């Protein structure tokens, strides 16, 4: 598992809250060479890796998450 789930500062807390409240707004798919292979989120079951980049005065905050294009479910939000 790469990335972390705990915010280091207020900007990160606010960015995570924003992303979790509306994950697909300005989100893009993260290209994966072999697709989603983690057994918890298999690409064959509809899962894709997504990211949002939130600009702040201190630089960008990037958050990755998993999205199931079939069910519309989101999971595994992490700071990158």
Residue ranges and their predicted role:
Residues 1-80:
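Catalytic toxin/effector domains delivered as secreted proteins or via bacterial secretion systems
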């Amino acid at each position: 598992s790469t990335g972390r789930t705990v915010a280091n500062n207020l900007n990160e807390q606010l960015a995570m809250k924003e992303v979790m409240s509306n994950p697909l707004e300005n989100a893009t798919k993260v290209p994966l060479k072999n697709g989603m292979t983690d057994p918890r989120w298999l690409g064959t079951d509809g899962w894709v890796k997504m990211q949002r980049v939130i600009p702040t005065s201190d630089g960008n905050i990037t958050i990755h998450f998993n999205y199931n294009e079939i069910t519309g479910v989101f999971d595994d939000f992490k700071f990158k």
